[in-house]
């Protein structure tokens, strides 16, 4: 089975790299990659949410700077649509610095992009010329991508092992289910995923436990007997990342899943034949006290889980930690255009076959459909802030952080 890729980065020749990103607005029926040549291209795909997920945003942002630098070193530098004096390195440095600020404005809530651009500024300030900057930036971006993938696998195993050991301590030995919201998998990262990475690790572990006697079976993460046998992804309105993207990944990986409405969480807990033992969510920013900014709807999921005694975990790499901001109330929450709430985009479907209707190019026909009165006022925040008090653990690549005896997180080791 081919691995899902949100970002196609061809880097065999460091002097002639190419970047394209999967247009996630067209999923699940259409697979189309958008080439990235400049910082403007990176800004556009991030702003329009053609690429999303905090780690992927940071990677695409960094890659767009690399691509513009490569373009400046070629005869096609005029395509950047931005004035550089190529005979003056200080001018180039100043202009790139301005461009980094512009790029950051594409999605201000996600700390990963800010952290990556801060690192690029260090690379920029230490370079003596454009070629050196581009070469060092190539090394930085490659490390950013490779570290992200390796860290995702570590996070997945850390979170899965922690939950399974927790269930073992509770003498819980049954099959169980988990919640997740938005999309935190391969489509939101360099691969494997954060919160969805934990779910992948839980599923891989459950399969190893059903293969007794098979000498080629995978090593179990723990000796506990519970198995995750079902995932309940929330649809995640209004952009439907859960129904369009997470469901797409779960089907792709043959992980048993049932898509549920955002408004059905409590009722699903009360009526599920399979006990729901945990929720795993991603993060766009985690501040010093553990308050977490994530996709709108995360807070209500956390509150409901708290009410029903279901463990709630945030899964994110250290690059998502905001080392400066003390509390969630100080996080700037991005508000999106009203039409993104009032208008939905999707593929036309044949009601007899449930298959997409194709055009003359054999591609699914897409359309925008209004679902609200034209003149109704709309409040459309992209994120909400979940207080640390609702979070049972923060899963990172270096381990799982829980609260101390005073009920507080100490994340200083991640700073």
From Swiss-Prot:
The reply to whether Secreted figures as a keyword in the UniProt entry is no
Question: E.C. number, please?
Answer: 5.3.1.23
* One GO BP annotation of this record: L-methionine salvage from methylthioadenosine
Pathway assigned to this chain's UniProt record: Amino-acid biosynthesis; L-methionine biosynthesis via salvage pathway; L-methionine from S-methyl-5-thio-alpha-D-ribose 1-phosphate: step 1/6
Enumerate the subcellular locations listed in this protein's record, separating them with semicolons.
Cytoplasm; Nucleus
Q: Which top-level group of life is the source organism from?
A: Eukaryota
Main location per UniProt? cytoplasm
Q: Which GO terms describe its molecular function?
A: S-methyl-5-thioribose-1-phosphate isomerase activity
Q: What is stated as this protein's family in its record?
A: Belongs to the eIF-2B alpha/beta/delta subunits family. MtnA subfamily.
What this protein is called in its record is Methylthioribose-1-phosphate isomerase
Q: Please name the source species.
A: Candida glabrata (strain ATCC 2001 / BCRC 20586 / JCM 3761 / NBRC 0622 / NRRL Y-65 / CBS 138)
Q: What broad taxonomic lineage does this protein's source fall under?
A: Eukaryota, Fungi, Dikarya, Ascomycota, Saccharomycotina
Name of encoding gene = MRI1
């Amino acid at each position: 089975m081919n691995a899902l890729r949100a970002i196609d980065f061809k880097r065999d020749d460091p002097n002639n790299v190419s970047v394209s990103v999967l247009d996630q607005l067209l999923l699940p029926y259409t697979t189309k990659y958008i080439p990235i040549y400049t910082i403007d291209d990176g800004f556009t795909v991030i702003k329009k949410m053609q690429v999303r997920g905090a780690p992927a945003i940071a990677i695409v942002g960094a890659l767009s700077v690399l691509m513009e630098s490569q373009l400046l070193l070629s005869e096609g530098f005029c395509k950047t649509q931005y004035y550089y004096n190529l005979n003056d390195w200080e001018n180039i440095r100043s202009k790139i610095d301005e461009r980094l600020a512009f790029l950051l404005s594409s999605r201000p809530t996600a700390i990963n992009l800010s952290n990556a651009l801060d690192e690029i500024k260090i690379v920029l300030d230490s370079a003596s010329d454009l070629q050196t900057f581009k070469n060092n930036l190539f090394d930085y971006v490659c490390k950013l991508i490779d570290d992200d993938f390796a860290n995702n696998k570590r996070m997945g195993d850390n979170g899965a092992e922690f939950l399974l050991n927790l269930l073992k301590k509770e003498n819980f030995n049954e099959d169980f289910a988990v919640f997740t919201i938005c999309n935190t998998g391969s489509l939101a990262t360099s691969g494997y995923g954060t919160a969805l990475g934990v779910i992948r690790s839980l599923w891989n572990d459950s399969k190893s436990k059903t293969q007794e006697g098979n000498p080629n079976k995978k090593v179990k993460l723990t000796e506990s007997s519970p198995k995750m046998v079902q995932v309940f992804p929330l649809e995640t309105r209004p952009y439907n990342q859960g129904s369009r993207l997470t469901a797409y990944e779960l089907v792709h990986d043959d992980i048993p899943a049932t898509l549920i409405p955002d408004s059905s969480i409590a009722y699903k807990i009360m009526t599920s034949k399979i006990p729901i033992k945990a929720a795993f969510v991603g993060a766009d920013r985690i501040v010093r006290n553990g308050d977490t900014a994530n996709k709108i709807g995360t807070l209500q999921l956390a509150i409901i889980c708290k009410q029903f005694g279901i463990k709630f975990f945030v899964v994110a790499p250290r690059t998502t930690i905001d080392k400066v901001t003390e509390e969630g109330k100080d996080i700037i929450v991005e508000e999106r255009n009203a039409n993104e709430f009032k208008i939905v985009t999707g593929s036309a479907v044949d009601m007899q076959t449930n298959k997409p209707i194709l055009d003359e190019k054999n591609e699914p026909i897409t359309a925008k459909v209004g679902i609200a009165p034209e003149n109704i006022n709309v409040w459309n925040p992209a994120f909400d802030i979940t207080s640390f008090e609702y979070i049972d653990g923060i899963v990172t690549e270096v381990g799982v952080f829980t609260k101390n005896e005073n009920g507080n997180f100490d994340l200083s080791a991640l700073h």
